[in-house]
Amino acid sequence: MKNKSLAILSPLCLALYAAGAHAALEPFSFKASETIKHESNVNHEPDQFRNADWISNTEFLAALDQALGRSKLLADAGVNYNAYKKEDSLNSWGYHAGAELDWETIGDLNGAFGADTSRRRYIQGVTSDEIVFPNQPTPTPVTELNMQTDHHVFGRIRLGGPSRWQLFAGGDASRRSFSASNFHSNDERQWSANAGTRYATSPDLVFGLVGNYMRGEFPHVTVGSFGGVPIEVASKFRTRSVDGTVQLQASGSSMLDASVGYTTQTSDALAKEVKFVNGSMNWTWTPPSHFTVKVGLKRSSDVDTTTTAVNNGVRYSNNLNGPSINNLALLNVTYALTAKVNLDASASYSHRKYADVSVFDTGLGQNVLVDGTVRTTSFFLSAHYQPTRTTDLTCGAGREVRHGDATFAAFSYADNTVRCVAAIRFE
């Protein structure tokens, strides 16, 4: 592993040395990065089964930002390789690719459409949270290589341009699948649409109203077998919500982006209709000092809701949904020590609540209700050094703890991480 890591880092070091000599590459840009990290629980298993390991992640990215008259074409593609020092059976290639066309007409009509796809190793609590039901086929052990593939297409349209009054609408289609055959219960499809309006009373204050509708299939439940082949039924769900939004530039150093609304969800996997208040808040404060403070809050049914993207999925519903109600909180503080050195501290908390989830129990031959709560707390401290405009070096350490209390085998775990990342960009 040591020689492998050095071999990977060598070309990056040469690139860092030559960073100031490259010519402008517009409209293209490229990035290469190397991450070396140590985790005390690489598979996010229960504490009594955890294994520590060193992991190397090598990634190469290419991007395009091309103006096409009044429109713009954006595209990016990347490939990465994860290598484990001890558990080399988990070594894997991953990728990401996406394209988007931002268009506008002579009038105030504009929009965007595009697609993206990605593939990566599934890690419990990182890529998404699976649901483990009683007396269903045992999901793939987290120590087995299980690749998660996501596909997503979208379209947006807006009328109003920079004027005070805007009308907008959009739609998304998403699909997620897993490579392990006995993990297919977590495969998901989702279609969503949204429409709304915004009104700016001033350049610093914008109000909005948006409605969202989505339907999908999740989870897939085994209800029996025929000829030794499991019979799976896809649970269908529908979610409807209405949200009021506000964007406020309170001062030159304070920006608030918030929403509050009401959601109803029906699902074959739920014993009754779920109704709850949803919302989000992102507040950024940059006082006249070296500090930047960001606070995020969110309440939703997004199964993909993560602490690194608190506000995703409220305005544009492209996150996959699930049968849990999720509350999240995020705090991030950055201190600019010098023009090239930043210190960063972040903390997050998530609370997922499952109630009256109905699933077919193959042992009893009838539906049973399961419920529970999953709570995850994490923090990370890091230092970021930017020796040149196109080079970065970041090192840090953190800890994540999850507590599961449920009738569907939501186990607890803890993971300590130490990580360093070196990156170079060519623009």
Could you describe each region identified by the protein language model?
Residues 1-9:
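Bacterial N-terminal signal peptides that target proteins for export
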Residues 18-20:
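N-terminal signal peptide c-region/cleavage motif recognized by signal peptidases
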Residues 23-427:
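Gram-negative and organellar
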